[in-house]
């Protein structure tokens, strides 16, 4: 089976062609980072309009690079949610329209299920069951995964997600958009010594996350310290260490609670080098393994949507002709494969 995947949940237009026998045949990605940089964040209306401009040329490019024509496509998968409703509807409209015109089945994919399954695109893919840490600009959650669609959310962010905290803290430090990667780059030059940043919600039972207080603590520290490059780097490092330690502590608890020894990390923040190092060390110390997608598939992309959609289309799941987008969509409401 060969599936065309379409991702337009936020500020990246991602298109891919995935074959269940040959693997990933092509993927094309357009990022709107430059478009939104002047505003310090994603402007939903601008994002939607840019998806409209880019999506059809990218589909043509992906099909050409995959040496695939319409007759070779067996189904279409598009991101249905969660995300920005205008951006979601662009992908949903195009995906449903192509499915109708080409007489192909189509399915709306959960964006976070795409991230969760992204490590399956790698040669050394994890086997079920495992615990997944999904960390991005909009989500931070720990999920017990027993199979595709067999999800139990163990904990999630009650306010700011980890990626959102990175971006907002970077803005406080005067760093350009997108802030998360720039803060991590600055942190690599710093030393956390001398700062005692809190590890939020680790002093109590449970697996939920909260990063808004840590952001406020960082803002107060910035205001109280000298405004020089090394001090800013040290504060960035202390902030990063606090976030990473918090995520690691919660992951260890989730693994102990489930009895699993495989950990998947996915989402934009999973590209963070310090997070990867810390979780790799932790899993080695407890005799487990950690899995994550390659860097280009940590952020939003069409490949993960094509892969996730293919699994459900193969199981006979598809949707009607209605164009739907779901800005909010709990992951654990998804049905299992038939």
Curated annotation (Swiss-Prot):
Main localisation: cytoplasm
Q: Where does substrate bind?
A: 134-138, 167, 180, 272
Which keywords does this chain's UniProt record carry? Acyltransferase, Cytoplasm, Iron, Metal-binding, Transferase, tRNA processing
Q: Which InterPro entries does the record cross-reference, listed alphabetically?
A: ATPase_NBD, Gcp-like_dom, KAE1/TsaD, Peptidase_M22_CS, TsaD
What does the entry list as the binding residues for Fe cation? 111, 115, 300
Naming one, the record's GO cellular component terms include: cytoplasm
Q: Which family does it belong to?
A: Belongs to the KAE1 / TsaD family.
Q: What does this protein do?
A: Required for the formation of a threonylcarbamoyl group on adenosine at position 37 (t(6)A37) in tRNAs that read codons beginning with adenine. Is involved in the transfer of the threonylcarbamoyl moiety of threonylcarbamoyl-AMP (TC-AMP) to the N6 group of A37, together with TsaE and TsaB. TsaD likely plays a direct catalytic role in this reaction.
Q: Which protein are we looking at? A: tRNA N6-adenosine threonylcarbamoyltransferase
* Natural source organism: Shewanella oneidensis (strain ATCC 700550 / JCM 31522 / CIP 106686 / LMG 19005 / NCIMB 14063 / MR-1)
Q: Which gene encodes it?
A: tsaD
């Amino acid at each position: 089976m060969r599936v065309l995947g379409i991702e337009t949940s936020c500020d990246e237009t991602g298109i891919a062609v995935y074959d269940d026998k040959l693997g990933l045949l092509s993927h094309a990605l357009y990022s709107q980072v430059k478009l939104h940089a002047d505003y310090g964040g994603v402007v939903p209306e601008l994002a939607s309009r840019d998806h409209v401009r880019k999506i059809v040329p990218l589909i043509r490019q992906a099909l050409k690079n995959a040496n695939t024509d319409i007759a070779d496509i067996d189904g279409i998968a598009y991101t249905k949610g969660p995300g920005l409703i205008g951006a979601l509807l662009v992908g949903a409209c195009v995906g449903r329209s192509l499915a109708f015109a080409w007489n192909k089945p189509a399915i709306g994919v959960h964006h976070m299920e795409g991230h969760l399954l992204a490590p399956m695109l790698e040669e050394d893919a994890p086997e079920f069951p495992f615990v997944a840490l999904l960390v991005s600009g909009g989500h931070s959650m720990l999920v017990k995964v027993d199979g595709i669609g067999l999800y139990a959310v163990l904990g999630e962010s009650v306010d700011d997600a980890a990626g959102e905290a990175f971006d907002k803290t970077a803005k406080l430090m005067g760093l350009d958009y997108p802030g998360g990667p720039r803060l991590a780059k600055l942190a690599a030059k710093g030393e956390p010594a001398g700062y005692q940043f809190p590890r939020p919600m680790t002093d109590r039972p449970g697996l939920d996350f909260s990063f808004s207080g840590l952001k406020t603590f960082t803002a107060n520290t910035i205001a109280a310290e000298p405004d020089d490059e090394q001090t800013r780097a040290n504060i960035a490092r202390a902030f990063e260490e606090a976030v990473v330690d918090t995520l690691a502590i919660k992951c260890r608890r989730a693994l102990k609670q489930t009895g699993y020894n495989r950990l998947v990390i996915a989402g934009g923040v999973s590209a963070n080098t310090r997070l990867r190092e810390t979780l790799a060390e932790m899993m080695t110390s407890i005799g487990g393994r950690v899995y994550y997608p390659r860097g280009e598939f940590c952020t939003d992309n069409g490949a993960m949507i094509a892969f996730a959609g293919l699994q459900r289309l193969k199981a006979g799941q598809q949707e009607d002709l209605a164009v739907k987008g779901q800005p909010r969509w709990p992951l654990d409401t998804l049905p299992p494969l038939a």
